[in-house]
Amino acid sequence: MAQNFSTVGDGKQMLLERDSSKRVLTGCFLSLLIFTTLLGNTLVCVAVTKFRHLRSKVTNFFVISLAISDLLVAILVMPWKAATEIMGFWPFGEFCNIWVAFDIMCSTASILNLCVISVDRYWAISSPFRYERKMTPKVACLMISVAWTLSVLISFIPVQLNWHKAQTASYVELNGTYAGDLPPDNCDSSLNRTYAISSSLISFYIPVAIMIVTYTRIYRIAQKQIRRISALERAAESAQNRHSSMGNSLSMESECSFKMSFKRETKVLKTLSVIMGVFVCCWLPFFILNCMVPFCEADDTTDFPCISSTTFDVFVWFGWANSSLNPIIYAFNADFRKAFSILLGCHRLCPGNSAIEIVSINNTGAPLSNPSCQYQPKSHIPKEGNHSSSYVIPHSILCQEEELQKKDGFGGEMEVGLVNNAMEKVSPAISGNFDSDAAVTLETINPITQNGQHKSMSC
């Protein structure tokens, strides 16, 4: 008998040690997730606050709003749930309802800001001239205000009035505990059917439908522009070859042009796929479960609910993890990368960022291709004679307001346009990105007129 008690005691000790190790690992992982979310979104906020050329771009208003919502997720939502996961109970008492409201508000604000960004990018690409006239800071602030107001309305009002709680068998009941018998250290976040469906529609399903439509149309516009540019490239190469009596290479260059066009389209598709794929993979499982849980009914033949609490919690964290990835996807273009490197002091360690950089200008005034250069001036730099010359450009100019003319994007720079030279050429911004493995971004695709010329944008 004593041996049996000893065996039972050893078994309990092993279970306690295993549970303790599991909690330590969970705590380390969740702490790392919270830290990366805080770091990434704080860097975005500080960069926009510190550098005026980032504040001056209206499209960055939406990025900073997204960063603020994700920062609030990391401050007001994630730490409290992480403490509960580690301790095994809710230690914050009456703060439960406020925390639930913060959870719904911050997560909804993050998703709605992603939706607003997709609409902004689509408007900028589909109607660039109207966008330049209409998209003022006031309009941007109005769009952001609508997103935040909607987030507050579907969170604090229903939660504080207890409209969100299930009146029948709740998720907690399905796990073997009835709402009336809940201990004070348990935070019941179960939702009733009406609120679960309506809030999921506003917070996720409608925004994700809008994002799918806008990004699909963005891809089609980009595809059309890329094919037009490819046709202009082939026409220019054909004219040059006829002029130089090198017609034998036409077929080879035509095949190369088709391959380049396909490569460009593939990179655009990859960029948009990453944007939508990360968002859907993080949030879709949670919102499917969020709509299923209120319809789960207790089964008399088994003690298990249709969805376990562990499964539900895992996908809750999947959704919050999206807040740590958003800064990488939406604020990792060239402008933000330079700002981040300055804030973190990395620009002093990077060998490519010298104090003075030499940029060669050919006899047409356009910059010569040089992959080692971190800064390439626009083609408006004045010509000096008929020979190529070198301009000495201080590296500090990269951080000044003259850089406002550089294009913004999702994860790199892509500017689809033409440079008027001796003949029509693809701009270095395209060839520099598409020929390398750098990420492709879509912010502005300049429209092509009927005669094949790109219109210039006026501020």
From Swiss-Prot:
GO terms for cellular component: ciliary membrane; synapse. One of its GO terms (molecular function) is dopamine neurotransmitter receptor activity, coupled via Gs. SUPFAM superfamilies: Family A G protein-coupled receptor-like. It comes from the Eukaryota. SMART domains: 7TM_GPCR_Srsx (SM01381). Keywords: Cell membrane, Cell projection, Disulfide bond, G-protein coupled receptor, Glycoprotein, Membrane, Receptor, Transducer, Transmembrane, Transmembrane helix. Disulfide bonds join C96-C187. Residues 50-60, 120-138, 217-269, 334-459 are cytoplasmic. It is a multi-pass membrane protein. The chain crosses the membrane at residues 24-49, 61-87, 97-119, 139-164, 192-216, 270-297, 312-333. Glycans are attached at N4. GO terms for biological process: adenylate cyclase-activating adrenergic receptor signaling pathway; positive regulation of MAPK cascade; vasodilation. It holds the Pfam family 7tm_1. Belongs to the G-protein coupled receptor 1 family. This is D(1)-like dopamine receptor.
